[in-house]
Structures are given as C-alpha cells and as structure tokens.
Amino acid sequence: MKFMKTNDLREAYLKFFESKDHLRMDSFSLVPKNDKSLLLINAGMAPLKPYFTGLQEPPKRRITTCQKCIRTGDIENVGITSRHGTFFEMLGNFSFADYFKKEIIPWAWEFITEVLELPKDRLYVTIYLDDDEAYEYWTTLTDVDKTHIFRLGKEDNFWEHGAGPCGPCTEIHFNRSEEIPTNADEFVKLADEDKIIEFWNLVFTQFDGDGKGNYEKLANTNIDTGMGLERLATIMQEKNSIFEIDTLENILSEVAKLANVKYGENQKTDISLRLITDHIRSITFMISDDVMPSNEGRGYVLRRLLRRAARHGKTLGIKEAFLCNLCDTVIRDSSEAYPELNSKKEYIKKVIKIEEDKFRETLDSGMEILNGFISELKAKNEKVLSGVDGFKLYDTFGFPMELTKEILEDEGLSLDEDAFHEEMKVQRERARSARKVSNYMGTDVKTLDIIPAEVETVFDGYDNDTLNAEVKVLIEGEDFTDAITEGNKAIIVTDVTPLYAEMGGQIGDTGVIFNDGFKANVLDTKKNIGGKIVHFVEVVSGELKVGDTVTIEVDKVRRENIKKNHTATHLLDKALTEVLGSHVHQAGSYVSNDRLRFDFSHFEAMTEEEINKVEDLVNEAITSVTPVVTEVMDLQEAKNSGAIGIFDDKYADKVRVVSAGEYSKELCGGTHIDNTGKIGLFKIISESGIAAGTRRIEAVIGKEAYKIVNEKKDLLKEISTKLKCSEKELLAKLDQQVKELKEKDKEITALKSKFASMGIDDIVSSSRNVKDINVISYELKDVDSDTLRDVCEKVRDKAPNSIVLLMSANAGKVIICAMATKDAVAKGAHCGKLIKEISSMLGGGGGGRPDMAQAGGKMPEKIQEAIEESYKIVETLAK
C-alpha cells in the first residue's frame, strides 16, 4: 500500500480540493470568534458556522481547510488508550449552497482511490437507512463494491444537534482485518472491535429539524465533510495507533530519550509517554494562538494540560523542566503548515518554561501535603479525601482538581467532588455576578443580526467626513419599521456612510444624520455579525422613512482625536517590541477619543526604566514628524513587506497597510492621522497585569498628556513645600525620612519582643494537662511573626513535656505558631495536625512537622474559640 507522511497527506488533500475550485483557507485560531458556545474550536466546521447559518457571506461558495482542533471531553483516557488525544487536525471541504451529493461522493472516491491509492477491496461505505439518493450516486458514479455499502440508522448516519439544519451523512471506512462483513450487523461488530475504522464523514445538510422529529427541506443545501488527519495517517502508514505515525512518533521518541525508557516495554511508562506526546501538541498550538495559562476558561484547560504533562514527566524520572524544549519537535514538524509556530517559537517556549517552573516549585510542596493527606486516610482506613482538603490544594498550591483526583486514584482513593465544588461556590458566584451578559458586540438588539443579505452597506469615510446616503433599513426596539419619529432611539442602516464602525479596538464614530425634515444624533456606529454597518441614533426632530435620502456627518473633532490615538497605538506596539523583545504580541486594544489601551503578551511587570524607554521611543517617533501612509495591497504582499497584524483574523484578499515611515508598519482598517507630529505628547499612565502572561498599558496623548505632566509637577511642588526643601533636595530628604522610620520600627519591634518576653512566666502558668501533655494555648496582643516564633520557642524551652500554641491578631489577620518538646511528640502531640485544624477554624490554612508548624488565618474574632478547641484536638491526638 502507498506510504504517505502526515504533512504530505495534508497538502495532498488541500491541493485536490483546490483543483475542484475550492478556496484553500488557513486554519482558524483555536480561540473561537464571536461564538460563546465554544471554549476552543473542536471541529473543522466550527469556525464556519456563520457561513452555514447565513449570518455571514463566505468568501467563496467552496472552501477547504485543515483546521487545528482541541477536544478535552475524553482527557482521562489520553495516554491510557492508544487512540485518544486532545489535539488533532481536521481536513474538511465545504459547500455553501453550491454542490451537493452528486459531486462530493465521486470526488471523495477519486481522492481516496486515485490520490491516496487505497485498495478498493478494503473500503466500505455506510449511508443513512432511507438515503436512496446517496446509494444511487455511490453505485452509479463510483466503482465501490455494492456489497461494501451498508445502511445504518439515525444514531450512526444522521447528523443533527437539537433544532436547526441537519441531514443524513455517509461515512467511509477502512477494513484493517481479513474478516469480510456480509451484513450491517457484522459490519458494526467489526467496527466496534476497531477492525474497521471510519476515517471520513460526509454530511449532507438538507433539512431543517424542529428537534421533535419533524423535518422540512432546506431551500439551500450544504456540504460539511470531516476527516481526521492523524487517523488517516495511521491507515496510510499502516500503524495501529496515532502515537506511531511519523509526527507523533518523533515527539514520543524524544520524551522516551529524555526519560531513558523504551516505548512498549512498560504499561505505566507508556501511558506517560503517550500523554506527554499528545499534551505538548495542544500546549504548543494553544499558546501560539495566544491562550495563556490561568485559572479559568481556556487558560485553565491549557494550565491543566501543561501540569498533567509536567507531572507525568516527573513520574518518568525527568528531573528538569523539559516541555519548553520538547515543543521544538512539534514546531519543527508542523511549522510548514502553521508558520505562526516558527514566528512565535521563543514566545511559546518562554510561556511554557515560566508555567512549568512555577508548577515544579509548587508540585513538591503540594505533593508533600497531599501525601500527608493520603497517609492519614490510609491510617484511618478511609477512602475519600475531603473536599475542604482538596480545595486547599487547589487554592494554595494551584493543584487542579483533576490532578488531585488522578494522584488519589493511583493510590486507590477518591476525592469528595461535591464538597470541593461547594468550597468553590463562593468564588464562582462572585465571578458570575461580575460577568455581564450581552448579545453580539455588546448590544441588546437581536434584530440587527438578521438584516437581509441583499442590503449592502459601505464605509467611505477615510477621505470623507460628510456623505449623502439612502436609508435601507430602520429598526426600533426589536422590530423592523418603515419609519422612526422624534424622541425615539433607533437603528439606521444606509447604503453608504462616512462613520467608522467599531472594529479592531477602535470605537465607533458619532455624528449626525439629517435632511430637511429630520435630524438624529448618532450615539454609536457598529457592525452586526454579518458585517453590516448600523448607526445607533436618538431622533431629535422630524420623521424618517425607509428610502429617504439623508446627509451623514461625522463629529470631526472626536474623529481627529481617535485618529491620533490610533496612530499612537501603532507606535506603542513597535516600541514595546523594541524594548521588551519579539515575543510581544498584541492581545487586544481600545482606541477612543480621549485615551488608548493596549494589551500585549509579556511575562512580568515592566520596570520603570522599560516604561520610560517605551515612552521615549514613541515620543521620538512623534517629534520626527513622520508621514503616515496608507496603502492597499494583496495580503501576501503585505506579509512579505514586513507588516504585522493579527493574522488569525480572516483578512480579505486586499488589505490596508498603515506605515509611519520605516518605524511602524501594520495591517489596519482603522482611521489614522497623516503625520505623527499631530499626536503631540505621549504619556503612559499605567502598566498592569490583566491575566497570566498578559500586560496592559493605558496612555494619553496631546492635551491629556500635558495635563498629567502638569498635575505631577504641582504634586511635586506640594510635597517639597510640606517637607520644607527644594524639589532637587526631595530624594535626599525622603531617604533620610525612610531611614529614620526604619530605625524607629526596629526600636518598636524590640520593645514589643521585650514586652512579650516579660510575660513568659504568665504564659507557662496558663498550661493545662491533657493526657499527660502540658498544653499551652495563648493569645499575644499585636506582635509580628518573628516575635511570636521567638516567644513560642522560649515558652517551649521553659515548659517540659509541652505543646505550645500561640496566636496573635495583626492588621485584621491572624498569625499562628506551634512548637512541641520531644517527649510531648512521643506521647502523640503533633503541631502540624493541631495547626491544620486551628487555622481552618480561623479561615486560613497551613501545616508542618510534629515538632513545629506555622499558619495564618483571617478571623481574629475566633481566637478564643480556637484556644478552647486546641485542648480537645490535643486530647484526640494523645496516645
């Protein structure tokens, strides 16, 4: 049988459908655009949903893609079986109201038998029970063996997802065995045994279902096919597992080399090898699409995958961080199809390294605590770890719940998941209440998304601030209307407009729409999901009807300020790359008339020196009075010219490139000034972190920037007046004041310690004898942790056969210290166990050794209650 490498298979498929007049599109980002139903793209058709639903016009009626996908529904099986994985590539060809069954069936057969040269005697086809049309085309337009066609039911060969577009499908299978099925039952049995594997699904979207079994024929039919690249490669390379195909085997071999083990010799190490091989692919591709590790959403998926892989690496005996280097193999083998991997290589490696190092630091500490929990459970002959303890591991050490579960399962134990989720409930409720729910693009009007496709709207405002236009659509509330009148808010859609619709971070223009008998203030301009430009207005006077001619005028002053801020944002982007490095990528922006905001990938807070350098570079570009030029060119020409852009966005064939001399060049559809000198002064007002690995800069320009400078100047003057020195002497004066304050602090701390030590005899005398152990539980007033530990040690040394528990409330928090003598430990005293329960009572956490432990809490009002409880706890611990 013909052998083909994975990368060659991908190219062969895409080329084949290009030859059938399909537009080859690059894979979309793993991060869905305008689709809140998905966390990550999980199917080839997922990014194309707006085309299938008719909300957006496809760039062509025929499209072919190889889409990167991630599915984590079966994550627990990854590594355990040889076929489960989280990352895969889905080959697909799609028709939007163009060709249908008659075309795709013979094309599919042509590709697999003539291009791939798969043996026909091993190919089988399934169709839906009553899809006679598909049967006819298979038997008349191909030479498939009729005895290899089986009719199956709805569960196998009918695609639907609730109400909406649906239809029958036909699946193509490959028989790996020597057994030949003679009927549908035998076929299904062999398929269930993985002797026959399905590798290509052709979905015929031809019905509109109501979700109750009733179907109407669609006016326009679509084709949606999907073929897993890795599964196809197992057939073409005659492998039994996806982990044996060329691209994955390269990764697996590298992991085995690092761990000094051989694949296939040990079931347990094989699981770890497969898991790491799969997960590093997902990790690499997710980061290349600017997903960052975090504790929520897709960032949590990434963190979970990375930490699972890191832990399994440690299980294999790999001592150092290794994932950041393992991704090199993924990038090398996949960058031809996904060039963004190469361009972001250092960025990907750095994100992985930081997260892996962070996890390795906490893993040892967390494992020590978890192993303690496991030992306690086994000693008590219990099988379930409490949700409280599981949540502490998550909250304190960043252990994902799933990781705790996996480690427990390895020991034959489990986690009380219900109780764990209860512990998280408060945090989730807080997050939920903070989350705002809105419809597409933040508006609450749904009707705007179903503006008829034949209504065309054009932006013609790069060189115009006033245009005459025809009113095409009017919307008031949730309804289309023929007319709008004074005093109402509405949406106006015109054939042309000079107003820029919010896009690419730039806010929408405002202005006025008027004619002789009508006037409305435009409050905002946006695009609906289909790209139609809509004006949100408040009617000032008169009446407007569909078909009327109006004049649209932009707010020129506001537009000019937006243009200045937008150009300044481009200069900032370039300056950040120069100062911080090539790993900097735009993660979001907000450009308004009075300020700008820029989110970017970076791993730590910027230093004052870096912020100053960035400011200086931007201001140098401004004072150089460089012309800002806009050119329209082919997308590939723009890329070749060095223009930067978020290439995950699907640009048109022709794109706008905005250049500020040789300094900055970006793909951008926004509005800009014609000269950098018009910006004036640029001033950064804040730099902060908004997510793991993502920073945010807020800045102002022109008058707003000068205002900031003057405010700081006035503040400096006021401070120097209060400190009775000149502005030049301020720093020396402050240094002197800080030095004096530190000396006073030392004196106060020494006095507190001395005062606390003076009462040691009183503390010792408070001892209670509990089962032949002297228990000393005491509250000290307003001392720091060093003083508390010092006093605790002195009390222990002065009180034989004792366990000492001291607590102090300081600035609304509780610090706790416990120490025990050797003879008390021998009798069952255990500081770590005591402090674990006490800190939990006080709303905190901690632990430690039998002879010494420390912790913190948040509820000083419960200290006295904790003191009384401590005697009971020691009583349960004493032998």
UniProtKB/Swiss-Prot annotation:
EC number: 6.1.1.7
PROSITE patterns: AA_TRNA_LIGASE_II_ALA
Enzyme class: ligase
Highest taxon in the source lineage: Bacteria
Signal peptide: none
Major location (coarse): cytoplasm
Catalysed reaction, written as an equation: tRNA(Ala) + L-alanine + ATP = L-alanyl-tRNA(Ala) + AMP + diphosphate
Alphabetical keyword list: Aminoacyl-tRNA synthetase, ATP-binding, Cytoplasm, Ligase, Metal-binding, Nucleotide-binding, Protein biosynthesis, RNA-binding, tRNA-binding, Zinc
InterPro entries (alphabetical): aa-tRNA-synth_II/BPL/LPL, Ala-tRNA-lgiase_IIc, Ala-tRNA-ligase_IIc_anticod-bd, Ala-tRNA-synth_IIc_core, Ala-tRNA-synth_IIc_N, Ala-tRNA_ligase, Ala_tRNA_ligase_euk/bac, DHHA1_dom
Gene Ontology molecular function, alphabetical: alanine-tRNA ligase activity; aminoacyl-tRNA deacylase activity; ATP binding; catalytic activity, acting on a protein; transferase activity; tRNA binding; zinc ion binding
Annotated binding of Zn(2+), by residue: H566, H570, C668, H672
Cofactor: Zn(2+)
Cross-referenced Pfam families: DHHA1 (PF02272), tRNA-synt_2c (PF01411), tRNA_SAD (PF07973)
Record flagged with keyword Zinc: yes
Compartment(s): Cytoplasm
Cofactor binding annotation: Binds 1 zinc ion per subunit.
One GO biological process term: alanyl-tRNA aminoacylation
UniProt comment concerning the protein's domains: Consists of three domains; the N-terminal catalytic domain, the editing domain and the C-terminal C-Ala domain. The editing domain removes incorrectly charged amino acids, while the C-Ala domain, along with tRNA(Ala), serves as a bridge to cooperatively bring together the editing and aminoacylation centers thus stimulating deacylation of misacylated tRNAs.
Family membership noted in the UniProt record: Belongs to the class-II aminoacyl-tRNA synthetase family.
Protein name: Alanine--tRNA ligase
